[in-house]
């Protein structure tokens, strides 16, 4: 399975790639890691393929006289036209994507890169400490990734280790029964409730795992989700 780890800056993508790939290896799987972030100084793990061995954001800035944002866009265009190793003998290949999500998600490059791989899915990470009061916004962002990249996308809430047990259980309740817990008290709340109802009409509800990329909490559930996506007979709800 080719697993692309997406998410906003600071959501914990690289740490998840590092520790989830180590977890899979301990479970007996052949795992490879791929770093597609040309701007990172140190991802914290040794990737089996690292785009920085070919170019970096800094090298593009020097070569073309671009600023950081222009260099990132150029890097994404180069990535889209590259042949990325597929590591055919691996059970799972975990891809670390750029820290700045927008150029990857909202330009054609991201779809072209991911579209070059069969048997694929996306893990879309969110920072629980920043999102626990805006879970609908996070879910809509993950849904955007699903539409844009045309790939099965699992929304994952990271950093559960930074919540108290009571806070974590409160988030789980919201994830399990968002409509029951939504009590419109203003225009924004009413809009949120109606959006939730509309989404549930067209998209079957899926699990939203709460994980910790740091401690490994929730990794077993992520592996189960990979099984279910792979066999197409599983139940993601």
What is the predicted role of each segment?
Residues 31, 153-155:
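Hydrophobic beta-strand scaffold residues
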Residues 152, 161-237:
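Canonical P-loop GTPase G-domain recognition
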Residues 1-6, 11, 15-112, 118-121:
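Nucleotide-state-sensitive switch-loop elements of NTP-binding domains
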Residues 145-148:
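Long, contiguous binding/interaction regions
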Residues 37, 156-158:
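Active-site glycine-centered loops adjacent to acidic/histidine catalytic or metal-binding residues
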Residues 17-18, 106-108, 135-139, 220-223:
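Conserved strand-to-helix beginnings and helix N-cap segments that scaffold or border functional pockets
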Residues 133-142, 188-193:
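Well-ordered, non-membrane alpha-helical segments in soluble/globular domains
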């Amino acid at each position: 399975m080719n697993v692309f780890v997406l998410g906003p800056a600071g959501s914990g993508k690289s740490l998840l790639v590092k520790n989830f790939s180590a977890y899979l290896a301990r479970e007996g799987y052949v795992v490879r890691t791929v770093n597609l972030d040309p701007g990172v100084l140190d991802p914290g793990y040794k990737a089996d393929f690292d785009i920085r061995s070919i170019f970096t954001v800094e090298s593009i800035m020097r070569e073309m006289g671009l600023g950081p944002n222009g260099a990132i866009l150029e890097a994404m265009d180069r990535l889209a036209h590259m042949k990325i190793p597929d590591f055919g003998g691996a059970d799972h290949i975990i891809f670390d994507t750029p820290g700045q999500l927008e150029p990857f998600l909202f330009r054609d490059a991201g779809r072209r890169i991911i579209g070059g791989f069969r048997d694929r899915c996306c893990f879309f990470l969110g920072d629980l400490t920043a999102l626990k009061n805006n879970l609908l916004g996070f879910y809509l962002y993950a849904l955007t990734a699903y539409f844009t990249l045309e790939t099965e996308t699992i929304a994952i809430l990271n950093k559960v280790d930074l919540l108290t047990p009571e806070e974590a259980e409160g988030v789980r309740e919201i994830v399990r029964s968002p409509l029951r817990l939504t009590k419109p008290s203003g225009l924004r709340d009413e809009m949120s409730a109606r959006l939730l109802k509309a989404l549930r009409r067209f998209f079957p509800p899926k699990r939203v795992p709460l994980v910790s990329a740091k401690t490994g909490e929730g990794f077993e559930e992520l592996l189960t989700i990979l099984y279910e996506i792979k066999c197409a007979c599983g139940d993601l709800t």
